[in-house]
Amino acid sequence: MMKKPVVIGLAVVVLAAVVAGGYWWYQSRQDNGLTLYGNVDIRTVNLSFRVGGRVESLAVDEGDAIKAGQVLGELDHKPYEIALMQAKAGVSVAQAQYDLMLAGYRDEEIAQAAAAVKQAQAAYDYEQNFYNRQQGLWKSRTISANDLENARSSRDQAQATLKSAQDKLRQYRSGNREQDIAQAKASLEQAQAQLAQAELNLQDSTLIAPSDGTLLTRAVEPGTVLNEGGTVFTVSLTRPVWVRAYVDERNLDQAQPGRKVLLYTDGRPDKPYHGQIGFVSPTAEFTPKTVETPDLRTDLVYRLRIVVTDADDALRQGMPVTVQFGDEAGHE
C-alpha cells in the first residue's frame, strides 16, 4: 500500500523535471537561437584632386591594395609652382608697404617736404605781388582785362601748389593715418591668404590615399586634363567591414549595441566570422528586398550595423551573411 504514494511522487518529480527542462529549452531557444540575414556592406569612395590640371602620372592600377598616405597620382606641378612664387612675391611687397606705414617718414623726407613748402610759399608771394601790380595797371587802363585774368590764374595756381605742399609736410610730421596703416595691414593679410591658398593648391596637385583599401576602378590616364573634383579612382575601404541586417520588434531586445554574434557565409559555413553590433536604428522601416527573409518583407524592422572583428579579403560587397545570436558567439 505504501508503493502507490511513492510511484505518484516519482511521477510528479519526473513531470516537474520535464516541464522545467522544456521551459529551459524554450528560453534558450528564445534567447540564443535568433537568426538574422544580411549582407556585407563595404564602403567605397571616389578619389579626386581638389584642383584641376593635366594628369602627370598615376602610381596604381585596378586591383592594387593601397595604404593610407600612399601617393596615388600627380598633376603637372609647374602651374602651381609658378602661382606659389607669385604669391610669395605679393607677400613681400605687401609686407614692405606695411612696414613703411608703421615706420612713418624719415627725417630726410620731412626736410624735403619743408623745403618744398618754402619754395611754394616764395612762388605764391611772387604771384600775389604780381597780381596786385596788375590790378593797379588795370585800374589805369594800362593793361587789358585778359592780362589781369592771366595774373589771377597764375596766383591761384601758386596758391594751390602751396596748400598741397603744406598738407604733405603736415602729413609727414604727424605720420601715416590709422586708416592707411589699417589698409596696408589688410593688404598684407590678403597676400598671406593668397600664399596659403597657393601652397595648398600645390599640395593638392598630389593625390594621397586617405585610408587603406583596394582600387576598384581607374577612371583616367596620364595626359588627361581634369577639372577639380573629377573622379580619378574608386576605392573599396577594407576596414572596417560591416554587415547590414534587420531585426523585427519582437526580437529587438536581443539586438543591443555591443552584443557579439557569429557571421556565416556560404563560402565557409563551418568557420564563422565574429562580429559585434555597433548600431541599431532608432526608427523602423520595411525590410529591403535584398534581405532573404520572405516572411518578414512586409514587416517593420530595425536596421543593424554589425562590425566584423576578424574580417578578411574573402568578404565582398553585397555577399549574403547569416547572423547567428547565441552564447557561443561571445566565447569563440
Curated annotation (Swiss-Prot):
Signal among keywords: yes
Repeat keyword on record: no
One GO cellular component term: periplasmic space
Alphabetized InterPro entries for the sequence: CusB_D23, UPF0194_membrane_YbhG, UPF0194_transport
Leader sequence residues: 1-16
SUPFAM superfamilies (alphabetical): HlyD-like secretion proteins
Localization per Swiss-Prot or TrEMBL: Periplasm
Positions in coiled-coil regions: 141-210
Name of a matching Pfam family: HlyD_D23
Keywords: Coiled coil, Periplasm, Signal
HAMAP family in the cross-refs: UPF0194
Protein name: UPF0194 membrane protein YbhG
Native species: Shigella flexneri
Organismal lineage: Bacteria, Pseudomonadati, Pseudomonadota, Gammaproteobacteria, Enterobacterales
